[in-house]
Amino acid sequence: MLNSTIPARIAVKICGLTLPEQAIAIAQMGVSALGFITVPHSPRYVSAPTIAEICRQLPPAVLTVAVVANLDLEALANLVTTTGVQALQLHGSESPEFCQSVRQTFPNIVLIKALRVQSAATLAAIPAYASTVDRILLDAYHPQQLGGTGQPFDWTLLKALHIPCPWWLAGGITPENCRQAIAQTQPQGIDLASGVESRPGVKDLGRVAALLSNLGINANHSLYPEGSRF
């Protein structure tokens, strides 16, 4: 439901990290979660060994998220074991039934299902996932890209919509519009990739700092730590 207020607590996930030194630096700024894209054709792709290297150096309070698309259970198990991530973000065409299988197979993994919003029909699918996943992530639709487009979807589609589980907003969020995005849509968290980059996979730490400053988040005051099952 739309209103003009900012929630008292908001999670911030920075996604599309590829450089260990940047991931460690951003984790120390007070973000809630870091996302690592494992889809090979993505310009933000990062290998499992690099993800594992990063995860070993992060505090457990920072949720580590592997972003995947249409992997089978065996591949997911190998990824979780190899990297040590705390969460899986299913960003492909995974069905509610498949998400249930993932939940049963990985009961201790935080499970996020991304939906790429093309129309109100996309949002109608949310209830089918809500009882299985820990978070829904609503992202902008693009016919060739799974995310990181830098474009928002039509936020007015969320007007008066009841989402029956915690959810995060993605797509076209920047340090400049983050407060507007949160006030207008009222998510529990926001997810940024291109909005804080100098180029795909390389973050602009100054823009990350500006984002967190605009939201009143710092290294000693992470408003919504996500690094445990919720």
UniProtKB/Swiss-Prot annotation:
Record keyword Ribonucleoprotein present: no
Source domain of life: Bacteria
Alphabetized CDD domains for the sequence: PRAI
EC number: 5.3.1.24
Alphabetized UniProt keyword annotations: Amino-acid biosynthesis, Aromatic amino acid biosynthesis, Isomerase, Tryptophan biosynthesis
Keyword DNA-binding: no
Pathway entry: Amino-acid biosynthesis; L-tryptophan biosynthesis; L-tryptophan from chorismate: step 3/5
GO molecular function terms attached to this record: phosphoribosylanthranilate isomerase activity
GO BP annotations listed: L-tryptophan biosynthetic process
Catalytic activity line of the entry: N-(5-phospho-beta-D-ribosyl)anthranilate = 1-(2-carboxyphenylamino)-1-deoxy-D-ribulose 5-phosphate
Pfam families on file: PRAI
Similarity comment: Belongs to the TrpF family.
Name assigned to this protein: N-(5'-phosphoribosyl)anthranilate isomerase
Protein species of origin: Thermosynechococcus vestitus (strain NIES-2133 / IAM M-273 / BP-1)
Gene: trpF
